[in-house]
């Protein structure tokens, strides 16, 4: 019998902060299960979830506006600890009898918070001391409004020069509010504060660990599918690979993986997928060579969005055909992860909503009435990688840079041809190999090569030749929403360029993309 890893759980209500998913990830890192719901959740839903504690996130709205979001009143009547962060603190203060005002002085960035009163939330936590021995905390502020009066049964725990109520608390009810972001690394003791709230105040055990998550997933898969057969589209990417390994552990040969080789993969990737999952791990894999079919469908097409749609359509067609060949398959497995599940709400604020499946694979034939198995749907990407390591997948495969779903179809600009893909594969492999050799691969967030459908004059021996151009692209980013181009050493870039031009017959020029995002996107198409 596996432990109930969902026994202790934190509910995070989202008011629209860009950091809300980070709050959830931090709670998970503490070994505690949590879910992220929209702020306009009902009392019945909260009761059914039965949280051990509730966190109210930050948000971009102003609590002083008439129709701004509010926490359900039941949050403060449920008898569990509540932790308000920024906007969450402000709405808590207002709803419980305090006062919030817009501030002329927007506080954004580092601040030092002076601790005035002892509190269970920060007891023994400090970054430095004042001259008279009071604890100081280095925190990250991001707010315009501020609490100007706290509810009558709260005490002021800490303040800054411009923010009189930086931390407030009602120790009896276990309600806490902070006017800064404990979830970001800039708040140096933020993780300790979250740990204090989740583990000590809410008394949650650290049950959410990779080994226990695997045991729980295996048990749930077996309970869901029994002795039925399951099909999975295996791409070799992180999510589908970890899904395959979990299902294989749970049901063994009752899993059939369909690997569609579309001719748009990286150098030797198809062989690596078959060797690793077929030969090494012993999974049941159907290898479908479909390069000609994909390239034929893409012939003559230059528009990036049209190319994406063609690749998606042909994949579904090929997968459907293979699925129909298998007998008695009752379940379709997908590598849906938790961020896929968090979707925009149809509520007034458009905040994150949960509980709706995001389907990665398109419509299966209507005659195939299959159930859906999504063993990763509670997990963030970093958790999926940790699970993969625990299941024996290699680190280099789990932590390699992102690769687009359409593959080289969007890294060959314009029309996609086999000749272009073959040249690009080899050039890209050289770039990645050199990054690894120079210990630069893990220092950049994403690196790849782009094929440009233009010929450039080159000199080879005593003759001139017109051959193709490729661009190297490497970026540094935290969230992939914005990115800086990576300042790779000139000597390194020269070495990569020389190797590509000398070793890949058909490429005469190598350029380096120095565009940031924005205005450019990370991928060229």
Swiss-Prot record:
Task: Name the coiled-coil region(s).
Answer: none
Could you confirm whether the keyword Cell division appears in this record?
Answer: no
| Key words, A-Z | ATP-binding, Glutamine amidotransferase, GMP biosynthesis, Ligase, Nucleotide-binding, Purine biosynthesis
Domain GMPS ATP-PPase as annotated: residue spans: 208-400
Reactions catalysed, semicolon-separated, are: XMP + L-glutamine + ATP + H2O = GMP + L-glutamate + AMP + diphosphate + 2 H(+)
Q: What class of enzyme is it?
A: ligase
Gene Ontology molecular function = ATP binding; GMP synthase activity
The molecule here is called GMP synthase [glutamine-hydrolyzing]
């Amino acid at each position: 019998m596996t432990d109930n890893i969902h026994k202790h759980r934190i509910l995070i209500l989202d008011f629209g902060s860009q950091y809300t998913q980070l709050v959830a990830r931090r709670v998970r890192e503490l070994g505690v299960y949590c879910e992220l719901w929209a702020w306009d959740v009902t009392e019945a839903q909260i009761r059914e979830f039965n949280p051990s504690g509730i966190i109210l996130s930050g948000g971009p709205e102003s609590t002083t506006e008439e129709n701004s979001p509010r926490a359900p009143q039941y949050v403060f009547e449920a008898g569990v600890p509540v932790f308000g962060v920024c906007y969450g603190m402000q709405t808590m203060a207002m709803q419980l009898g305090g006062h919030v005002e817009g501030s002329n002085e927007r506080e954004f960035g580092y601040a030092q918070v002076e601790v005035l009163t002892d509190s269970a939330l920060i007891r023994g936590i400090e970054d430095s001391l004042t001259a008279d021995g009071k604890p100081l905390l280095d925190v990250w502020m991001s707010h315009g409004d501020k609490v100007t009066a706290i509810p009558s049964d709260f005490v002021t725990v800490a303040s800054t020069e411009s923010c009189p109520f930086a931390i407030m608390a009602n120790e009896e009810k276990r309600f806490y509010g902070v006017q800064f972001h404990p979830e970001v690394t800039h708040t140096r003791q933020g993780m300790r504060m979250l740990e204090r709230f989740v583990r000590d105040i809410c008394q949650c055990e650290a049950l959410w660990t990779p080994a226990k998550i695997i045991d729980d997933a295996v048990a749930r898969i077996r309970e869901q599918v029994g002795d039925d057969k399951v099909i999975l589209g295996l791409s070799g990417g992180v999510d589908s690979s970890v899904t395959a390994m979990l299902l294989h552990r749970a049901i063994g040969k009752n899993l059939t993986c369909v690997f569609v080789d579309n001719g748009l993969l990286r150098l030797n990737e198809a062989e690596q997928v078959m060797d690793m999952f077929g030969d090494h791990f012993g999974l049941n894999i159907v290898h479908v060579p479909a390069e000609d079919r994909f390239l034929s469908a893409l012939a003559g097409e230059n528009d990036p969005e049209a190319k994406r749609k063609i690749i998606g359509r042909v994949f579904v067609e090929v997968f459907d055909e293979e699925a129909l060949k298998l007998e008695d398959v009752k379940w379709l497995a997908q590598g849906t992860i938790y961020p896929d599940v968090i979707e925009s709400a149809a509520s007034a604020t458009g905040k994150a909503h949960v509980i709706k499946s995001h389907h990665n694979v398109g419509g299966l034939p209507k005659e195939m009435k299959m159930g859906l198995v999504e063993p990763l749907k509670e997990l963030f990407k970093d958790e999926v990688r940790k699970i993969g390591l625990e299941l024996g997948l290699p680190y280099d495969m789990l932590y390699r840079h992102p690769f687009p779903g359409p593959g080289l179809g969007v890294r060959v600009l314009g029309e996609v041809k086999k000749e272009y893909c073959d040249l690009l594969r080899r050039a890209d492999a050289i770039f990645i190999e050199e990054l690894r050799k120079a210990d630069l691969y893990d220092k950049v967030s994403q690196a790849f090569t782009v094929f440009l459908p233009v010929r450039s004059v080159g000199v080879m021996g005593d003759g001139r030749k017109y051959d193709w151009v490729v661009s190297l692209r490497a970026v540094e980013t935290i969230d992939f929403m914005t990115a800086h181009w990576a300042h790779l050493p000139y000597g390194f870039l020269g070495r990569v360029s020389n190797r590509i031009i000398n070793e890949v017959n058909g490429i005469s020029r190598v350029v380096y993309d120095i565009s940031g995002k924005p205005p450019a996107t990370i991928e060229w198409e």
